[in-house]
């Protein structure tokens, strides 16, 4: 794997573990020689994960919105920035430039990105591992909702199980790497279609 997108909050949250885990993710990816693709921001968990990657010798590729770029909210340390006009264009760039995805604690934007990734994998528009870092149970309620959606037959068991979930940064990254998919992987079989 060459590039992994990390989606996370533009804020640090009120639990110091979120920032600690964001830093660990950047450090672990760097130790494995994997570049970080992220939202380009110079704030919150985005700044922490990108700085950790840059401090440890890999590239951080920022994919930001023109509106935020104009407000000078972009990490000034970035050598590689892609600026998009819309959120849809931004998510498309993430999907094109990444071999896998990690979602850390975050808000509505992180939830939107997670849902888009799961839907794109389900439809076969992408075929890439998606990991969810469940720091101190942050995503427990979301996972419970997903399980309920599986029970009610709105999400397939296979699509739910395709999401890689861990509360450990190291374990999550290792599971994502183990689940790297060849270009010719038949996603329909993996999802039970």
Please tell me what each predicted stretch does.
Residues 1-97, 136-170, 181-193:
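A cross-family phosphate/adenosyl-ligand binding-site feature
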Residues 89-124, 131, 182-190:
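Active-site/ligand-binding-proximal alpha/beta "capping" segment
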């Amino acid at each position: 794997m060459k590039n992994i997108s990390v989606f996370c909050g533009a804020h640090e949250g009120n639990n110091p573990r979120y920032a600690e885990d964001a830093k660990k993710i950047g450090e672990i990816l760097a130790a494995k020689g994997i570049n970080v693709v992220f939202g380009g921001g110079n704030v919150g968990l985005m700044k922490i994960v990108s700085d950790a990657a840059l401090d440890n010798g890999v590239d951080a590729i920022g994919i930001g919105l023109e509106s935020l770029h104009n407000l000078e909210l972009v990490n000034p340390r970035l050598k590689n920035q892609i600026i998009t006009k819309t959120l849809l264009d931004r998510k498309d760039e993430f999907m094109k430039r990444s071999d896998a995805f990690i979602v850390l604690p975050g808000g509505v934007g992180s939830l939107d990105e997670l849902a888009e990734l799961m839907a794109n994998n389900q439809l076969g528009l992408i075929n890439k591992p998606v990991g969810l870092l469940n720091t101190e149970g942050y995503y427990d309620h979301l996972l419970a909702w997903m399980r309920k959606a599986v029970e009610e037959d709105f999400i397939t068991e296979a699509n739910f199980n395709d999401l890689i979930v861990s509360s450990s940064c190291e374990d999550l990254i290792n599971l994502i790497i183990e689940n790297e998919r060849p270009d010719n992987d038949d996603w329909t079989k993996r999802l039970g279609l």
